[in-house]
Amino acid sequence: MAGLDLSLVLMLSVLAGVREVSLTQVNQQGVIAPGDIIIGGLFPIHEAAEAVNFTGLNSFSSFQHPVCNRYYTKGLNQALAMIHAVEMANQSPMLSSLNLTLGYRIYDTCSDVTTALWAVQDLTRPYSYCDSQTNSSQPVQPIMAVIGPSSSEISIAVARELNLLMIPQISYASTATILSDKSRFPAFMRTVPNDEYQTHAMVQLLKDNKWTWVGIIITDGDYGRSAMESFVKHTEREGICVAFKVILPDSLADEQKLNIHINETVDIIEKNTKVNVVVSFAKSSQMKLLYEGLRSRNVPKNKVWVASDNWSTSKNILKDVNLSDIGNILGFTFKSGNVTAFLQYLKDLKFGSEAKMNNSFLEEFLKLPEIGNAANAVQEQIKNTHLDMVFSVQMAVSAIAKAVVELCVERQCKTPSAIQPWELLKQLRNVTFEKEGVMYNFDANGDINLGYDVCLWDDDESEKNDIIAEYYPSNSSFTFTRKNLSNIENVLSKCSDSCQPGEYKKTAEGQHTCCYECLACAENQYSNHTDADTCSKCDTESLWSNANSSKCYPKFYEYFEWNSGFAIALLTLAALGILLLISMSALFFWQRNSLVVKAAGGPLCHLILFSLLGSFISVIFFVGEPSNESCRVRQVIFGLSFTLCVSCILVKSLKILLAFQMNLELKELLRKLYKPYVIVCMCMGLQVTICTLWLTLHRPFIEKVVQPKSILLECNEGSDLMFGLMLGYIVLLALICFTFAYKGRKLPQKYNEAKFITFGMLIYLMAWVIFIPVHVTTSGKYVPAVEVVVILISNYGILSCHFLPKCYIIIFKKEYNTKDAFLKNVFEYARKSSENIRGLSGTDPHSKTDNSVYVISNPSLVPEEKQVSVPEIDNVL
């Protein structure tokens, strides 16, 4: 930019030194119309200029001056739009009521900065040499405003000179963002939005169509570089990557250099096979050459070309190529209004000798080979009408006309220098003008932002294109007017294929973020949309997912379920046990007076059966979804019921030991201690105390154990110590029972209750000894089943050893269920025991004492447990 400023200073110095050089001498063309207020116009009547040596006057013997070539019909069309707009304004009541007219002086910029500055120099000096016939000088009015130029590059250079005189400049097509900076360009205004809106709209279009791998082509200069900078800024923000950036030379004069750049650009496009969308801010003539180069290459024909306003309506590009050769072209154009009057003006325009005299641009236009006659000239102008450009020019003229009227209402503006350019500039910044019934005004940056139309090119030679969408900067959104766009929507422009749900993108270091590989999400992570940057984590407290998952799944609650086959089997065994208990209880109640029932404990049998019922019922609370209540109830019910059972068995063991104890002293002691219900209550009381402390201090509770795919619901015993005390206490009672029963293991064969108690307690002890390591090492939902199995083994062990033999005698061996059979069995047992003792002591086994008690003469030779007497029947029964 500093280099451009220096060039401008040098150029102004040169221009200041050659004020005497006439326009005719430097081949400068123009169109002039008189008026009270003069407006300057700068339009690209030619597309290029090349410098040639020119012999000047005075101190400058020679210097380089550009000569224009490559006639640009669209530029003439824009100049005619200004002429028509001025004529319409002069005919309006707004100006005619003040008896004012607008005049103009229009010059050709030749699409060249230097040529444009020559024109500005001529516009801003008090005298002009425009009469090519007489070369005479005549005083002219100073210009009050300038309309144009179209190119941002040229507008920037022109604006810097006009800023010095504060002459308002209104461009109808310059969109460079830098021109909105009022601190640098205070006199510049425009009737189009700046490129910041256009690049944002383009990126929004790319984003909406998921085109993330694109290329950009610009023409070198302030406009192109500013547009590329703005475009890249927006793409980075939206995650879109630019695969390549091509900068074509600004000058069109050096065709050899231009062709080299065009061929290099074709190579780049051909190499980037995955880039199917290209955004271009280049000149239309350069795009024409590019398309001609692509036509002969092996380049996919389904590309989408996004055209900036710089060439979006220049359909002369398709003169030698078809859309089928290059793809689809989407063009961004400025929104326009009704320009029917201008089209009619072109039809009515006379292209005779009078027109040639007043307009040198028309004179050259009519000499073009493709024109030939006036009819062709009209058709060519209509074909090259850019509706958006025409409307923008008309708005610029309307704004100036309205501002002039507002200034001249209270002053005589027909007097020269009645108003100054800076006054008009100030008025323009605040003016509100009407066109086609719509009110317009400039914003704080001096811009009028109407938005954009998005057009889709077709092969029709007319300049009209199919408008498919409208873009509104106020809400950064598109409104599509055409729904069927499959040929556009089906185009893919991505560096990498989309990652599917369940995958995420991983970009290698140093690569574009749009070039990546797709990796599967890990376990307990997911991605639920395509092209996810990262995988989201599942809430592992309640959710889970497999690898490569697109969503999280709720964890199911896991517990020892009712419908589990194992649970059904255990519950069936518990139910059978309850049926057995009920049956045995009924049988024992019916035979309550029989010797077998009395010998088995009488009322204690029913108490044992009741306790076993509670133990079987506790199994139910180990199955199903646990709760705090079930966790507490199940252990307490089992603990208390089995304590009651073992306590009753302990009483039975003491009774048997008392009945068959032959040691009189020990027998007397046992008789004093034998208080059945007191013993049962004491044993139960201690267990109740343990359970109460447990439930009070460290009560069991439900615990949720988070597992990879489920949540295990299990009972936490609260205190392993209290749980161990409860079970340990029962084990202690069982050991005592086992000890007592073991001492009476050799009782009468048909009444060996102690042996059955021994087996029952042995089964219980073995089951619970196995339970401890299994319970500690087992985890999962079947932990409750382990305890249930042990409970059932214990219950069935007691049923089998204590009650089934009695039931067998009652039902099948009724002859043993008599007092005589029972006494016979007992006395036989006592006799054999005495004989064994006498044999050990050397006494005659047939000798008897008077009190019917066998006396051992040398008791020290016999162990204490062998010293027996005839049992008392009452203690047994």
From Swiss-Prot:
GO BP: any one term: sensory perception of smell
Site (Important for basic amino acid selectivity) residue list: 389
Residues making up the signal peptide according to the UniProt record: 1-24
GO cellular component: plasma membrane
Superkingdom of origin: Eukaryota
Stored InterPro entries: ANF_lig-bd_rcpt, GPCR_3, GPCR_3_9-Cys_dom, GPCR_3_9-Cys_sf, GPCR_3_C, GPCR_3_Ca_sens_rcpt-rel, GPCR_3_CS, Peripla_BP_I
Name by which UniProt lists this protein: G-protein coupled receptor family C group 6 member A
Species per Swiss-Prot/TrEMBL record: Carassius auratus
Biological classification of the source: Eukaryota, Metazoa, Chordata, Craniata, Vertebrata
Gene giving rise to this polypeptide: gprc6a
